[in-house]
């Protein structure tokens, strides 16, 4: 089916808002296809942009990525969005969506998840990250030994990585920090290369996230762990160049 067809179907559903609740609208096959088509168009657009600037991305590689991509819409309120590099799952009922007071804004937020996850598909090096995590899980620095690993504290950390009881939570923490930094990187890249409506969609989602964020101290008062509170500040800084202080 053409992109025009799915856009028309979405408009028909949107115009019947009173008769079609969000639970039906955002998980309908028409909406899923609209979202998947938009995701594939993004990949095509960015690949074309990079080729124009001399990057070696073949049309065969572009087609492979586009044809492999699938999108799934989920109603689980605990799910925001995620991707494995090929498939995108988007939560349509999480708090970053439901906090918004109109269907149009909720639509923009959901599509903001699509923009974010496509950015991961385009700019995150999944094979390298997998290798890094697998080596670290075995207590091995990869792809190279850190510069300060030979110093006293570095040598002690390297030794402790051989202890599975220490290594497992260390890898989990390292992965969480890496993902926060990666989120900042991929959002900057996609906004640079694919502006327009996609930027508006991503901004809608980001504004909700900022508005719901609190300071390190406020998170501790809510009984969050110190690491969770710290990670939230890292994410805010990586994505938006801000932190929430307690002043």
Sequence positions of predicted segments:
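Basic/hydrophobic alpha-helical interface regions
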Residues: 1-222, 237-238
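Negatively charged
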Residues: 236-247
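Amphipathic alpha-helical elements of HEAT/ARM-like alpha-solenoid repeat scaffolds that form extended
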Residues: 228-235
């Amino acid at each position: 089916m053409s992109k025009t067809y799915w856009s028309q179907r979405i408009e028909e559903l949107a115009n019947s808002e009173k008769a079609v609740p969000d639970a039906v609208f955002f998980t309908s096959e028409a909406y899923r296809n609209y979202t998947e088509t938009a995701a594939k168009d993004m990949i095509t657009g960015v690949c074309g942009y990079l080729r124009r600037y001399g990057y070696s991305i073949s049309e065969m590689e572009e087609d492979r990525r586009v044809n492999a991509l699938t999108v799934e819409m989920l109603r689980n309120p605990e799910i925001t969005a995620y991707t494995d590099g090929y498939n995108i799952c988007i939560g349509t009922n999480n708090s970053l969506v439901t906090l918004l007071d109109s269907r149009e804004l909720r639509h923009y937020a959901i599509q903001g998840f699509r923009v974010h996850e496509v950015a991961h598909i385009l700019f995150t090096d999944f094979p390298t990250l997998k290798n890094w995590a697998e080596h670290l899980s075995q207590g091995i620095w990869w792809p190279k030994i850190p510069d300060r690993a030979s110093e006293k504290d570095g040598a002690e950390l390297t030794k402790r990585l051989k202890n599975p009881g220490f290594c497992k939570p260390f890898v989990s923490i390292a992965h969480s920090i890496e993902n926060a930094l990666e989120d900042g990187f991929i959002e900057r890249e996609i906004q640079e290369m694919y502006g327009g409506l996609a930027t508006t969609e991503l901004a809608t989602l980001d504004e909700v996230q900022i508005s719901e964020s609190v300071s390190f101290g406020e998170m501790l008062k809510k009984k969050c762990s110190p690491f969770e509170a710290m990670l939230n500040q890292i994410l805010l800084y990586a994505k938006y160049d801000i932190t929430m202080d307690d002043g």
